[in-house]
Swiss-Prot record:
Keywords: Cell membrane, Ion channel, Ion transport, Membrane, Metal-binding, Sodium, Transmembrane, Transmembrane helix, Transport. InterPro entries: FluC. This is Fluoride-specific ion channel FluC 1. GO terms for cellular component: plasma membrane. It comes from Staphylococcus aureus (strain NCTC 8325 / PS 47).
């Protein structure tokens, strides 16, 4: 049954990721991918902290959210492809800004999620 929940979570995450991708513009800053990945980092941190208090009795739900929903929502491969595209088009400042923003804020938001979740549990 766990596979079914992961499948459902994945379908919902993929759908949301698809809808967010419309925020990306041709040749512009990939804001949709950035939003999806930073949101995923925050929620993963939050759920990590909340696992002990709220998900210990519901491991299947946690897997549905983390592996299914967040796994489909976030997209490391698209992020890498966008960086290569920027490199190929000599958009070096945008590439650097996107990479640093994604990594630094991803780590920061995951940390904030962990701290916030720890305060709630």
């Amino acid at each position: 049954m766990q596979y079914v929940y992961i499948f459902i979570g994945g379908a919902l995450g993929a759908l949301l990721r698809y809808l967010i991708s419309f925020l990306n513009t041709d040749g512009g800053f990939p804001i949709g991918t950035l939003i999806a990945n930073l949101t995923g980092a925050f929620v993963m941190g939050l759920l990590t902290a909340l696992t002990i208090a709220f998900f210990s009795n519901h491991p299947t739900l946690k897997k549905a959210i983390t592996t299914g929903f967040l796994g489909a929502l976030t997209t490391f491969s698209t992020f890498q492809l966008e960086l290569i595209h920027m490199f190929d088009h000599q958009q070096f400042i945008t590439l650097l800004l996107y990479a640093v923003t994604s990594y630094v804020f991803g780590i920061l938001l995951c940390y904030v999620g962990i701290k916030l979740g720890g305060g709630l549990s």
